């Protein structure tokens, strides 16, 4: 669903920012 896609994008963004 859209929520899952948003979750994935948020995770990737956090990973990029932190690491």
Swiss-Prot record:
Name of the protein in its database record: Ascaphin-8
Which residue windows are coiled coil? none
Which keywords has UniProt assigned to this entry? Amidation, Amphibian defense peptide, Antibiotic, Antimicrobial, Cytolysis, Hemolysis, Secreted
* Expressing tissues: Expressed by the skin glands.
Q: Which GO terms describe its biological process?
A: defense response to Gram-negative bacterium; defense response to Gram-positive bacterium; hemolysis in another organism
- Compartments, record wording: Secreted
The organism's lineage is: Eukaryota, Metazoa, Chordata, Craniata, Vertebrata
Function, in words: Antimicrobial peptide that shows similar potency against Gram-negative bacteria and Gram-positive bacteria. Has a high hemolytic activity.
> What cellular-component terms does GO give this entry?
extracellular region
């Amino acid at each position: 669903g859209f929520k899952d896609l948003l979750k994935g994008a948020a995770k990737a963004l956090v990973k990029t920012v932190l690491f």
